[in-house]
Amino acid sequence: VKSRTFLLLLSVTTSLFAATKASKTHTVSVGAVRRVPYTQPDATADEKADETSSLKVRALFVDDRQKDWTTGELHEITDRTFAIRRALHINDALPSDTAPHWIWQPGSWITVDRVSGHITALHLPDFDPIVSNAVWFRDYAAYCGTASTSKGANLYVIVAQLGSRRAVVQKLIGRWPQPNHFIPVCQPAKWERLPLRVTIQPTGDEATTYDVVGTSSIVEEGDNDDNN
């Protein structure tokens, strides 16, 4: 009887411990803005000599532990999930260099779950860190992107939706790369709610409006703790 009682108590204790661990709420925050030197990766030698440009970066924390560097403003997708762009600290040293040469570059996008602390890397279609400046609305992101084909690379207008592998909108607007291209390549997208559509203008060219026909929001928000 004592043995059975002990096993029962052990089972209850284990279940309570597992439930407490699974329901643990994490604290997610971003730090203060820090300005760091930044040069466009495809800049000319003269442009690279100009060290006046900078990138605003902020640390991303989960439970007071830094998980990543970010840049730009975060976008609240739901009341518990937000998207934010990564900032990469890259060693740009050549094999012949004797010391590391660290540079900052904007990276891809991630989503962060405030409850579970889970961080997910987003693979937005045709997203190019040099070209793409995503503007969000709900779970949609609109931007100009690039993609390579057997005949070369092209520049596209892209509207992506989270959870969808293919772009909701993909419109060819030119070849890429372009000599002496504008920076930015495209102006920030402008969204309209009803009807759902977005206007994108390549810099120096005419703006075009695209109707967006997607699905209902399919952002997956789980309660599982991934030990972040």
Language model features with spans:
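Surface-exposed loop/turn elements that mediate protein-protein interactions on large endomembrane-trafficking
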Residues: V36-K67, W104-L124, L155-R175, Y210-N224
